């Protein structure tokens, strides 16, 4: 099946907002951010700004998408200059896969954690390295929500602990938790393809025996963990709050993302009855809500 790709250039200040607009208002199937200077892609430490000064945005659409409508919507957003440059091209499946692989670089989170495409050389062999091939599942580390969760996991002492990755996607958070010292991780997702991607990536990282994955309806009864991370969306975080809170042991830790800054307080309020909520962490309008369950 062919695809349509639209390439735009943006500054580091507005790239995330443009990406969100392309997904929400033009029907983009995926949005990828690339450093226009083709230098390695790094995720910043908390409080630091993105290193890119010039960012290319690649938006992928179904072959039947109306490109005139898409360009009109981009212009109407007033996020780019009236005479902004863009490139439209048709990609066959194999061309898109090659393009994606060529542009997915190793990324560093905090002081010691690297997320590395399985086909790339490891930049720091002595660091904590997660080898990743996302396949059809969400989660490469390039989005602020994933970065916020990875940085939070790295900040914890996970030695000997059990972790639940609620909405595991590609398994990036689950595998990172194991690499950071967790004894066992349970991944839960509504998408069978995500479970398979998580299994494959765990096998690639040599941690398959420490990861179990389940559809929600198949998860063990009474499941509970020392640490729970849920990188999903604000709506499900509100609706599923009783379930998510029940997964956390007393005095256990919970982090949630997939939440915009305008949604953070409302989502946090669904958890304050059982958790002491930390100051909300923000990155590019996205937030992480974390806290410790009362004993």
Swiss-Prot record:
InterPro entries: Ribosomal_L11_MeTrfase_PrmA (IPR050078), Ribosomal_PrmA_MeTrfase (IPR004498), SAM-dependent_MTases_sf (IPR029063). It is found in: Cytoplasm. It comes from the Bacteria. It catalyses: L-lysyl-[protein] + 3 S-adenosyl-L-methionine = N(6),N(6),N(6)-trimethyl-L-lysyl-[protein] + 3 S-adenosyl-L-homocysteine + 3 H(+). GO terms for cellular component: cytosol. S-adenosyl-L-methionine binds at residues 146, 167, 189, 231. GO terms for biological process: methylation. Gene3D superfamilies: Vaccinia Virus protein VP39. One of its GO terms (molecular function) is protein-lysine N-methyltransferase activity. Keywords: Cytoplasm, Methyltransferase, S-adenosyl-L-methionine, Transferase. Its main location: cytoplasm. Its EC number is 2.1.1.-. Methylates ribosomal protein L11. HAMAP family: Methyltr_PrmA (MF_00735). PANTHER family: ELECTRON TRANSFER FLAVOPROTEIN BETA SUBUNIT LYSINE METHYLTRANSFERASE. Belongs to the methyltransferase superfamily. PrmA family. NCBIfam families: prmA. This is Ribosomal protein L11 methyltransferase. It comes from Vibrio campbellii (strain ATCC BAA-1116). The lineage of its organism: Bacteria, Pseudomonadati, Pseudomonadota, Gammaproteobacteria, Vibrionales. The gene is prmA.
